[in-house]
Design a protein with these regions (language model features):
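Non-catalytic, well-ordered alpha-helical scaffold segments
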Residues: 1, 17-20, 40-44, 61, ...
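Interdomain motor-coupling "hinge/lid" segment immediately C-terminal to the ATP-binding subdomain
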Residues: 1-57
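Short, positively charged loop/turn segments that connect secondary-structure elements
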Residues: 31, 68-79
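Loop/helix-junction capping segments adjacent to catalytic residues or to phosphate/diphosphate-binding pockets
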Residues: 40, 57, 74, 197-198
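Short, locally clustered residues in the helix-turn-helix/winged-helix DNA-binding domain
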Residues: 48-52, 68, 145
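Short acidic, hydrophobic short linear motifs in intrinsically disordered regions
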Residues: 56-67
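A cross-kingdom feature that marks ATP-driven nucleic-acid transaction machinery
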Residues: 79-250
Length: 250
């Protein structure tokens, strides 16, 4: 996480205890008191569900279905929306909207929620679900916002030939992040690893479907030498991205 006091603590146990206590005794209690929350268990369940699905497309309606099927809760859609707003207002989570790049418009739902601090997210789940792929995506999102970018989740339509049907079909491809700052724009894919050519092709597909001049970037976990391929796509390592504010211009 990015909380200064946690970073200064000498042991992992102390850090975990501090984050857990901060979540329970400060964030949760403040949200409940400030917003006069009556369904406190449902509020905590919402936090758990969102913490478990960082980087996944969702919306209040899908969350309500999860509550009804798995938690046997009858929470109303309106209450669920309000509770999510409370979490955003408390700077626990942040909403990333979907943006249709070619259509130049926002798509209402589904959308994504990222945690403002991944340490708090991990503490909430007792450090059990520490999937590096999802956490890396969350970290990239937070870092882009820290650098002053407006960050959306991108989508682009690609037309391909369906040989079986004998006609062209439209496929929706996701761009992890569309980062805007003034006249600047960057398309960024978070790829934990690129172990083979198939994975490379998969990550590049949405970027190659874009036909504008804005920079296209793939960030991987491994420490690699930054390189720009024949398609003009820059691939660089996570640590280079985090430690160099000018890396997007490489």
């Amino acid at each position: 996480g990015g909380l200064p006091l946690a970073a200064m603590m000498p042991t992992e146990e102390q850090k975990a205890q501090y984050l857990d206590q901060l979540f329970r005794e400060t964030y949760i209690m403040d949200i409940i008191a400030r917003n006069k929350v009556r369904q406190t268990q449902e509020l905590e369940d919402i936090i758990d569900v969102l913490a478990s699905s960082v980087g996944a497309l969702t919306n209040p309606t899908k969350l309500q279905a999860t509550f009804q099927s798995k938690l046997k809760s009858k929470i109303s859609l309106n209450t669920l929306r309000h509770y999510i707003e409370y979490l955003c207002d408390a700077f626990l989570i942040h909403e990333a909207k979907r943006y249709d790049v070619k259509g130049r418009k926002y798509i209402g739902t589904p959308l994504k929620y990222y945690f403002e601090d991944v340490g708090l997210r991990n503490a909430r789940l007792n450090f059990r679900q520490v999937e590096e792929t999802h956490l890396m995506e969350n970290v990239l999102y937070n870092e882009l916002r820290l650098r002053g970018f407006n960050v959306d989740v991108g989508t682009v339509q690609k037309r391909t030939m369906d040989s079986a049907a004998g006609k062209r079909v439209s496929t929706s491809l996701e761009i992890d992040f569309v980062a805007n700052q003034g006249r600047k724009r960057y398309y960024i894919q978070s790829a934990f690893r690129l172990p083979d050519e198939e994975k490379v092709r998969q990550e590049k597909a949405s970027l190659l479907a874009l036909h504008d001049s804005f920079k296209k970037i793939i960030v991987v976990k491994d420490a690699i030498k930054p390189r720009t391929d024949d398609d003009g796509i820059l691939t660089l390592g996570l640590y280079d991205f985090l430690l160099n504010d000018d890396c997007l211009e490489w």
